[in-house]
Regions:
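Core of compact, soluble alpha-helical bundle domains
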Residues: 1-149, 154-155, 166-193
Length: 193
C-alpha cells in the first residue's frame, strides 16, 4: 500500500503523531517519560516491563497501569467489536463506492482503531486525560482529508472502542476511564467541523 501513497501523504503520516508527552515532564521523571515516548516512537503498546517500571516509580498509578495492560491484552477483541459496530452502522461502507473500499482502506481503518486504543492506554497508564498533540492532530486531520477517510465511521468506531473497552472493566471504573476515550472522540469529531 505504501507504494501507492503520494509523497505528500507519506509526509502527513510521519507528522500525524497524535500523542504528546511534553506536559508529562512535570509529573514523571525523564526515564518514565522516555518509556512512554519509546513505545509511541515504535508504534507499540507499553510492555509489561514498561508498565511495571511506571507503577514502581508512581505507585498511585498501579491500578491504571493494570487497566492499560488488560486493554492491551484484549485489543484484538476490542477492535473487532468496534469494527463490527461500524459495519452494522454503515453496512455498505466496505462495498464498491463505500468509504472503506477497496479492502486496503478498510484494513487501514481497523489498524487506526488499534492505534487509537494504544494512544488511549498511554493516557490511562499515565493518568493523563489530555494526552494528544495539537500539531499531530492537525496533520492527522489533513491526512484524513487527503485520503477522504469517512469521519462518521471513524467516530462511530472510536465510540465502539470506548464501549468495548469499558465493558471489560469493573463498572465503577467506567466513570474514571471514560474521559480518556472521550478526549480522543472529541478531537476526532472536531475533524468534521
Amino acid at each position: 500500500m505504501s507504494e501507492q501513497l503520494s509523497e505528500a501523504v507519506r509526509q502527513l503520516i510521519a507528522k500525524a503523531r497524535i500523542v504528546s508527552f511534553a506536559a508529562w515532564q512535570s509529573t514523571y521523571p525523564s526515564e518514565i517519560v522516555a518509556r512512554f515516548q519509546a513505545a509511541d516512537d515504535e508504534g507499540r503498546y507499553l510492555t509489561d516491563e514498561d508498565l511495571q517500571a511506571i507503577a514502581t516509580h508512581q505507585p498511585e498509578v498501579a491500578e491504571s497501569t493494570a487497566i492499560a495492560q488488560m486493554l492491551r491484552d484484549r485489543v484484538a477483541e476490542i477492535v473487532e467489536e468496534a469494527r463490527a459496530g461500524v459495519l452494522a452502522h454503515f453496512p455498505d461502507i466496505t462495498e464498491p463506492g463505500g468509504g472503506l473500499y477497496p479492502p486496503l482502506r478498510a484494513e487501514a481503518c481497523w489498524r487506526d482503531f488499534w492505534h487509537f486504543l494504544r494512544c488511549i492506554t498511554y493516557g490511562i497508564a499515565g493518568q493523563q486525560t489530555v494526552y494528544t498533540s495539537d500539531e499531530g492532530l492537525y496533520h492527522m486531520k489533513l491526512l484524513y482529508q487527503e485520503l477522504q477517510v469517512p469521519l462518521d465511521a471513524m467516530v462511530v468506531g472510536l465510540e465502539g472502542i470506548k464501549t468495548a473497552s469499558l465493558k471489560r472493566c469493573r463498572s465503577e471504573q467506567g466513570e474514571t476511564l471514560a474521559p480518556y476515550f472521550d478526549h480522543l472522540i472529541t478531537q476526532l469529531d472536531a475533524f468534521r467541523g
